[in-house]
C-alpha cells in the first residue's frame, strides 16, 4: 500500500484537489475535505497493515477509488442509491453497495474488513454511537477504525463568531448538513466508550487551534 500514489495538493489543484468550498450536488471529483484528510487516512491504513477497507458513506466514490489506486481492496457503501448509481457509472472498476449505516450490517460484511473509514459521516447522523457499532461489526478482530469530522474548538468557534461567520456553520435553514458538532474531548470520549485500543488523534488542515478537521484512529480488540 503506497501513499506515494496520491497526488500532491500542489500538483494540479484544479484537477486532483478541489479549490472550492462547495460540496453541494453530485460531481465526479473530490470534495473539499479530501484535500486535507486523504493522506493522513492512507498513512494510518498503511501503518496498520490494512488490506481490505470499508468506506462508510462513500458518496460519489472519489475517495474509494483513491484507496483502490493506493493498492487497497475497498468496498464503498452509502445510503443514497441514486448517488451510488452515478458513482458506479463513473468508476466501473470500483465496488459499491447501498447500505444504511443506521441499520444492521448486511449479511456477509460482518468481521470482514481490516479497516473501516468514515469521512465526515459521524457528525451527519442523529445516532453516532449506532454508526460506530455498525463500523465495528464490519471489522476483523484487531481491525482499524478511522473517523474524521469537522473540528470545533473554543478558539475556532470564537474566531468564527468575531468574524460574523457563526451562522454559516450552524445554519438551521440548510436542507442537509451537520447535526452534531464535535470537539476533541467529546469525539475521543465517544470512541473511548467502545473500549478500542491504541487511539490516535490528530487535527488536519490549518494550524491545530483553527483546524479544518480532526481524525481519530483506533483498533478493535484482538
Positions of the model-derived regions?
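A short beta-strand submotif of the Rossmann-like class I SAM-dependent methyltransferase core
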Residues: 115-121
